[in-house]
Amino acid sequence: MSQVISLLHDKGGCAKTTSCVNLGFALWLLGKKVLLVDTDPQCNMTDTVDKTVHLEAESTIYDWLHDFKPGEKRSLPIYTRYDGLDYVPGSHSMSNINAELQLMYNREHRLSDFLDTVDPESGAKIRNMYDYIFIDCAPGGETLMNTNALVASDYVIVPTEAGIYSLQGLPRLLDYIEKVRTQLRCPVSILGYLLVRWNAQKAISKEVKAYYSNEEEVKAPLFPVYVRECVRCTESVAYEMSLFEYSPDCTAADDYMRVAEYLIGRKARPKTWTPRKWGQIANAAFQHFIKEREG
């Protein structure tokens, strides 16, 4: 069974999508089967993985959550970027989903029901087809869609910008997750805080690190790897690339790879596993993806 992990924060602009995409790609490069799920109406994850899917997709996560009925035969909204790296595209119509969920039976469990759906080809539940499933959540905290993500998840990763605004909203987020845990009786917990846009030269980065290092205060550990400030994070999105395809030797690519290695329990990186090596694998896969898409 996979680990289902939501990336969630009360505020926007804290690299949830960047972290979702690049952790997913890093784990794929490490040989894991990965599914990325986009529940944010901005669809930034979908646009990063494949911009054309909004024009060509027969089904998105919105279509499934909006009107799927148990027992109904319908193609799953799962698409393939690379062999072993799949994604469920989002939709701008997700801006309506919270109001629509209010009227639905079992409204907090729609996404969980989706992951429990049996794939007709493999005969396995979706959640059992992958090693890791990452859910890119919308900012805004306590919404029915985010509640769906928490109910469907085993863990939450909280990407946290190394700036003063990252401290705002944390008490609300912690209260929200605890309320979902207790009231809906789901076992979700915070896997850790992922410090992003880290700059060791800035005093505020050090202050934020010190705050999140107080596990008694923030109720979860801080990941031991910090994702450094890197302009390549913004640039790569424009080319529908992860960092590993766009700039495999940049600092952020190395940091996200180290976070992925931490997740799988790798204690030390083999000497042969270098930016050059993972860049070759990622670039070859990307060129094949573009060739296939262009027909």
Annotated model-derived regions:
Residues 1-295:
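P-loop NTP-binding core
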